[in-house]
Amino acid sequence: MGKKSRVKTQKSGTGATATVSPKEILNLTSELLQKCSSPAPGPGKEWEEYTQIRALVEKIRKKQKGLSVTFDGKREDYFPDLMKWASENGASVEGFEMVNFKEEGFGLRATRDIKAEELFLWVPRKLLMTVESAKNSILGPLYSQDRILQAMGNIALAFHLLCERASPNSFWQPYIQTLPSEYDTPLYFEEEEVRCLQSTQAIHDVFSQYKNTARQYAYFYKVIQTHPHANKLPLKDSFTYEDYRWAVSSVMTRQNQIPTEDGSRVTLALIPLWDMCNHTNGLITTGYNLEDDRCECVALQDFQAGDQIYIFYGTRSNAEFVIHSGFFFDNNSHDRVKIKLGVSKSDRLYAMKAEVLARAGIPTSSVFALHFTEPPISAQLLAFLRVFCMTEEELKEHLLGDSAIDRIFTLGNSEFPVSWDNEVKLWTFLEDRASLLLKTYKTTIEEDKTVLKNPDLSVRATMAIKLRLGEKEILEKAVKSAAMNREYYRKHMEERAPLPRYEESDLGLLEGGVGDSRLPLVLRKLEEEAGVQESLSLTETVSKVKAAENGLVNGESLIPNGTRSENESLSPEESENTTGDTEESSGSMDAVKERL
């Protein structure tokens, strides 16, 4: 994506002339693998571990300096070749051009008026780099033997990209030459830029991403040097950390899901041309047309000639955008922060609370979200907080009697409080919890705003501080919202106002009979109405998808974080509705299994 590629462009033709002993690097990578495979550090020790791993990585990078495969010239020099290649192979190339938009980097600009919902871009399967094409490439023999490559499609795609980049006659060279040489993902942050994220919620994922990427590189360096099926790979004589970091970032910022050719499963893919579109708020307008076997995109809105063409990547928080896509999106209507809550097993009423939560399809301990938009909490979190704050008598009312099931159904509905006292308690609790989270930051909102005025601040440091500031602003907003609700319900309690009562016909949420198995669906229905996207299983997600014209579908990611096994099959219903999701579905390399 353009926004992810503001940094310098790829520069040189083949590997460089520096010499370093493979055995020397093998020893260093063995040390790195051991360090990255050690147990997770204790509280407060994560930064120390990060700096130790980073020191080893930097030592390896220094030894390998000049060994990476790169390209001559700037990436934009290759745009004409990309358009010619795409056109010759059946992609649409009319109506737009690739342009540098300064702050957002490269993107697509309309060269004619494009109407909302007009099909303006399509890319056939043959142009896509997929896990399937990786299996059929020079990587195939190693793929067939390595369980990590088989289980983690994103890693297989990264190696596919590296092998094709190192092959001058690769079919995908016109595409690969237009990819940026560096990214703004945290893997490229300087240590001081990472330090800007200290005390944020995102820092733990940043540490994990860096550690797992280092571990993967160390593991695969040994594989490439020693595995008999790696002998013919063009990486045998030159596989640097810089190469792997680039491939990892290329994939995590660009990968998407598409159905396999027979439509029975989903696979990961890189989609040339389409992946030049930058993000804005809206709806997903990209899907996969199985009949024509191509990725298709309709216009999100009316675009006039000269306008930048945007698409919607999905409901990602800014932490996800920064960590996995390498950019911060201002005014992100889907921004949120995590809040971990659970019912203590030492709670005298634990068993009763656990049972009520189970009937509502909610775990006794989970990570919820506080949202940038109103309301700040989802129906699921509201239901959890209500149960969390219930008295013994209130719990009995939700477990026993003819109206118990009906009460469960309205747990996530803000219009029907359990009691005024319960509402006061839950909003007081949320206010206190958000206030405590705010106090964990080392800087204030005002201090962050002052730092952002510094004209010498790097792009990556700016992203980090904006992310830090955004987290605090969401928490501060939650505190204010909770305080307002607390006082609202306290007033009702003092006035002894009658509780709103519902009629069975008001629910309108049941499909068929009443039963405990339907309860989670009610909360999910409320989530939809509130505009809140909670994580659902693959089947549940597909069932929500509505087919649109041109075989396109607007839907959520079918593979959370792109880490589902490539061997997992889809049901016929899922196969019919599977789409190529936008960048919102981009997964990260830090999802690699712990055994790596």
Curated annotation (Swiss-Prot):
<feature type="binding site">
    <location>
        <begin position="325"/>
        <end position="327"/>
    </location>
    <ligand>
        <name>S-adenosyl-L-methionine</name>
    </ligand>
</feature>
<dbReference type="GO" id="GO:0045944">
    <property type="term" value="P:positive regulation of transcription by RNA polymerase II"/>
</dbReference>
<dbReference type="InterPro" id="IPR036464">
    <property type="entry name" value="Rubisco_LSMT_subst-bd_sf"/>
</dbReference>
<dbReference type="GO" id="GO:0018021">
    <property type="term" value="P:peptidyl-histidine methylation"/>
</dbReference>
<keyword id="KW-0009">Actin-binding</keyword>
<feature type="region of interest" description="Disordered">
    <location>
        <begin position="551"/>
        <end position="596"/>
    </location>
</feature>
<dbReference type="InterPro" id="IPR015353">
    <property type="entry name" value="Rubisco_LSMT_subst-bd"/>
</dbReference>
<protein>
    <recommendedName>
        <fullName>Actin-histidine N-methyltransferase</fullName>
        <ecNumber>2.1.1.85</ecNumber>
    </recommendedName>
</protein>
<keyword id="KW-0808">Transferase</keyword>
<feature type="binding site">
    <location>
        <position position="254"/>
    </location>
    <ligand>
        <name>S-adenosyl-L-methionine</name>
    </ligand>
</feature>
<feature type="domain" description="SET">
    <location>
        <begin position="94"/>
        <end position="314"/>
    </location>
</feature>
<dbReference type="InterPro" id="IPR046341">
    <property type="entry name" value="SET_dom_sf"/>
</dbReference>
<dbReference type="InterPro" id="IPR001214">
    <property type="entry name" value="SET_dom"/>
</dbReference>
<dbReference type="InterPro" id="IPR050600">
    <property type="entry name" value="SETD3_SETD6_MTase"/>
</dbReference>
<dbReference type="GO" id="GO:0003713">
    <property type="term" value="F:transcription coactivator activity"/>
</dbReference>
<keyword id="KW-0489">Methyltransferase</keyword>
<comment type="subunit">
    <text>Interacts with MYOD1.</text>
</comment>
<dbReference type="GO" id="GO:0030047">
    <property type="term" value="P:actin modification"/>
</dbReference>
<feature type="binding site">
    <location>
        <position position="75"/>
    </location>
    <ligand>
        <name>S-adenosyl-L-methionine</name>
    </ligand>
</feature>
<feature type="binding site">
    <location>
        <begin position="275"/>
        <end position="279"/>
    </location>
    <ligand>
        <name>S-adenosyl-L-methionine</name>
    </ligand>
</feature>
<comment type="similarity">
    <text>Belongs to the class V-like SAM-binding methyltransferase superfamily. SETD3 actin-histidine methyltransferase family.</text>
</comment>
<dbReference type="GO" id="GO:0000785">
    <property type="term" value="C:chromatin"/>
</dbReference>
<keyword id="KW-0599">Photoprotein</keyword>
<dbReference type="GO" id="GO:0005634">
    <property type="term" value="C:nucleus"/>
</dbReference>
<dbReference type="Pfam" id="PF00856">
    <property type="entry name" value="SET"/>
</dbReference>
<keyword id="KW-0597">Phosphoprotein</keyword>
<keyword id="KW-0455">Luminescence</keyword>
<dbReference type="GO" id="GO:0042800">
    <property type="term" value="F:histone H3K4 methyltransferase activity"/>
</dbReference>
<keyword id="KW-0949">S-adenosyl-L-methionine</keyword>
<keyword id="KW-0539">Nucleus</keyword>
<dbReference type="GO" id="GO:0003779">
    <property type="term" value="F:actin binding"/>
</dbReference>
<dbReference type="Pfam" id="PF09273">
    <property type="entry name" value="Rubis-subs-bind"/>
</dbReference>
<comment type="function">
    <text>Protein-histidine N-methyltransferase that specifically mediates 3-methylhistidine (tele-methylhistidine) methylation of actin at 'His-73'. Histidine methylation of actin is required for smooth muscle contraction of the laboring uterus during delivery. Does not have protein-lysine N-methyltransferase activity and probably only catalyzes histidine methylation of actin.</text>
</comment>
<keyword id="KW-0963">Cytoplasm</keyword>
<dbReference type="GO" id="GO:0070472">
    <property type="term" value="P:regulation of uterine smooth muscle contraction"/>
</dbReference>
<dbReference type="InterPro" id="IPR044428">
    <property type="entry name" value="SETD3_SET"/>
</dbReference>
<dbReference type="GO" id="GO:0018064">
    <property type="term" value="F:protein-L-histidine N-tele-methyltransferase activity"/>
</dbReference>
<dbReference type="GO" id="GO:0005737">
    <property type="term" value="C:cytoplasm"/>
</dbReference>
<feature type="region of interest" description="Disordered">
    <location>
        <begin position="1"/>
        <end position="22"/>
    </location>
</feature>
<dbReference type="GO" id="GO:0051149">
    <property type="term" value="P:positive regulation of muscle cell differentiation"/>
</dbReference>
<dbReference type="GO" id="GO:0046975">
    <property type="term" value="F:histone H3K36 methyltransferase activity"/>
</dbReference>
<feature type="compositionally biased region" description="Acidic residues">
    <location>
        <begin position="571"/>
        <end position="584"/>
    </location>
</feature>
